[in-house]
From Swiss-Prot:
This is E3 ubiquitin-protein ligase RNF146-B. Keywords: Cytoplasm, Isopeptide bond, Metal-binding, Phosphoprotein, Transferase, Ubl conjugation, Ubl conjugation pathway, Wnt signaling pathway, Zinc, Zinc-finger. It comes from Bos taurus. SUPFAM superfamilies: RING/U-box (SSF57850), WWE domain (SSF117839). Coiled coil: none annotated. Ubiquitinated; autoubiquitinated. Autoubiquitination is enhanced upon poly(ADP-ribose)-binding.
Length: 347
């Protein structure tokens, strides 16, 4: 009858006689010099240490960071610049991998150069190539890729549209790095190029200059239907009331004079006047005259309307200067209020 789990005796007497009690387990089994990755469940290739001290393959961390910027074990956030500046446990292995163990190595195309595959993927590609296979699958950064050894391209198994060239070449050709990790000799220059191109920092000075120039130019403003720039002084807003009333008076006179002219005679009007005639107010004048006869209108309004009637219905043979002299040098002009009442201002 089998004994239960609780009946098993794990005492020191159960140990073999050739093993001492104080002997550690590491002496009985070979120690693992390369840590294991908790993502791919294999020995780490180019192991990196996160700020939380967990160790993974560089490509495994890269693939996990695309899905979420957190550690796969403790869920602590991964810094944004970790992929550009990873903490390698053994930087010397990267240089050794770039030198390679054989005569040939496998590369995939990058921007402005070639990247060397990591050691594990290179062994898989070399094994498939030596066996004459047409294609093989690779697990890279958490994604399954298909390497077409006939056309020498690679693509994701679930996305055939994105293809990248691959090649088998000698180990000593110029390269950007290994498995996305740049070599030390190119790190400084490449980081500067990345900072000036990826984030648009190189275009900031030009954009700032353009923005200052564009902000200094204000849009044109409209004054009485005419476009004026901010630098151009606007028309004098403090024009005296006398000029405005004189303008209205001359406009009324021109309307009265044009009523006695034939059609087409307005074209021969003297250009020295240079003034735009005021709109026709005959209807308003008629309404004001009719309201002066009602009992609700005050005597002051009636007096103003009579004065305006005398001004707006002049003798055709009398000029403006004659009327001004006859009135003793005083010109009275009617102005209409918003409430419909009329006032007369003496100039």
């Amino acid at each position: 009858m089998m004994a239960g789990c609780g009946e098993i005796d794990h005492s020191i007497n159960m140990l073999p006689t050739n093993r001492k009690a104080n002997e550690s387990c590491s002496n009985t089994a070979p120690s693992l010099t390369v840590p294991e990755c908790a993502i791919c469940l294999q020995t780490c290739v180019h192991p990196v240490s996160l700020p939380c001290k967990h160790v993974f393959c560089y490509l495994c961390v890269k693939g996990a960071s695309w899905l979420g910027k957190r550690c796969a074990l403790c869920r602590q956030e991964i810094p944004e610049d970790f992929l550009d500046k990873p903490t390698l446990l053994s930087p010397e292995e990267l240089k050794a991998a770039s030198r390679g163990n054989g005569e040939y190595a496998w590369y995939y195309e990058g921007r402005n150069g070639w990247w060397q595959y990591d050691e594990r993927t290179s062994r898989e590609l070399e094994d498939a190539f030596s066996k004459g296979k047409k294609s093989t699958e690779m697990l890279i950064a958490g994604f399954l890729y298909v390497a077409d050894l006939e056309n020498m391209v690679q693509y994701r198994r679930n996305e055939h549209g994105r293809r990248r060239k691959i090649k088998r070449d000698i180990i000593d050709i110029p390269k950007k790095g290994v498995a996305g990790l740049r070599l030390d000799c190119d790190a400084n220059t490449v980081n500067l190029a990345r900072e000036s191109s990826a984030d648009g920092a190189d275009s900031v000075p030009a954009q700032s200059g353009a923005s200052v120039q564009s902000s200094s130019v204000r849009p044109l403003t409209s004054v009485d239907g005419q476009l004026t720039s901010p630098a151009t002084p606007s028309p004098d807003a403090g024009t005296s009331l006398e000029d405005s009333f004189a303008h209205l008076q001359l406009g009324g006179d021109s309307i009265a004079e044009r009523s006695h002219r034939g059609e087409g005679e307005e074209e021969h009007e003297s250009p020295s006047s240079g003034r735009v005639p005021a709109p026709d107010t005959s209807i308003e004048e008629t309404e004001s005259d009719a309201s002066s006869d009602s009992e609700d209108v005050s005597a002051l309004v009636a007096q103003h309307s009579l004065t305006q009637q005398r001004l707006l219905v002049p003798n055709p043979s009398q000029t403006v200067s004659d009327r001004s002299v006859a009135a003793g040098g005083t010109v009275s002009v009617r102005s209409r209020r918003p409430d419909g009442q009329c006032t007369v201002t003496e100039v």
